[in-house]
Structures are given as structure tokens and as C-alpha cells.
Amino acid sequence: MENVNTFLEKVLYMEEDRGIADPPLDSLLSRSGSKYGLVIYAAKRARQIDQYYIDLHEGSFYAHVGPLVSVDADDKSLTVAMREIAEDKLDLKSSAAE
């Protein structure tokens, strides 16, 4: 009976799949000055993450910084970039000055 209860707890409290709406766009916009700035910054970071995986595959480890948040195997680089922004792993203010 204990195994059944443990299984039910895992099913009931299982984390839902995250998608493009998680993190919520409103919280992302509060970290950025504008929609345009958020889109540009997230796209640049997604390209860096893609390049990191390419470099990793080719054996070069130090050219780009990899993901700063936990990543699932099926996560897209843009989703990872958005999560990094939502969790304050990146400084959007300094990038606006560049």
C-alpha cells in the first residue's frame, strides 16, 4: 500500500511541462526595458547556447558559456535563454549599453 501512495503522490505533484509561456512573458518584460530589447537579448543568448553545444561537440570548451539553468534534453535554446532571464542569471542592463 505504501508503494501505491508514493506513486500517487508523485503523479499528483508532478511538475507540469514547461512551454513558451513559462516563464510568463509579463515577468520577463518586467526584467527588460522593452519587448524589443527582450527579444533581441533572448535571441542573442539562444545563439550563444547553440554555439556552446556546437563547440562542445567539436571538442572546444571555452569559446561560449553554456546554459546557466537546468536543462532537459528536449529544451530549445530560446526556452533556456528565457528561463535564464526569468531567474536573473543574466544582466540585461549591461547588455543595453553595448
UniProtKB/Swiss-Prot annotation:
Keywords: DNA-directed RNA polymerase, Nucleotidyltransferase, Transcription, Transferase. It catalyses: RNA(n) + a ribonucleoside 5'-triphosphate = RNA(n+1) + diphosphate. Its EC number is 2.7.7.6. Promotes RNA polymerase assembly. Latches the N- and C-terminal regions of the beta' subunit thereby facilitating its interaction with the beta and alpha subunits. Pfam families: RNA_pol_Rpb6. One of its GO terms (biological process) is DNA-templated transcription. The keyword Transcription applies. The RNAP catalytic core consists of 2 alpha, 1 beta, 1 beta' and 1 omega subunit. When a sigma factor is associated with the core the holoenzyme is formed, which can initiate transcription. SUPFAM superfamilies: RPB6/omega subunit-like (SSF63562). GO terms for molecular function: DNA binding; DNA-directed RNA polymerase activity. GO terms for cellular component: DNA-directed RNA polymerase complex. It comes from the Bacteria. Belongs to the RNA polymerase subunit omega family. InterPro entries: DNA-dir_RNA_pol_omega, Pol_omega/Rpo6/RPB6, RPB6/omega-like_sf. The lineage of its organism: Bacteria, Bacillati, Actinomycetota, Actinomycetes, Micrococcales. SMART domains: RNA_pol_Rpb6. This is DNA-directed RNA polymerase subunit omega. It comes from Tropheryma whipplei (strain Twist) (Whipple's bacillus). The keyword Isomerase does not apply. NCBIfam families: rpoZ.
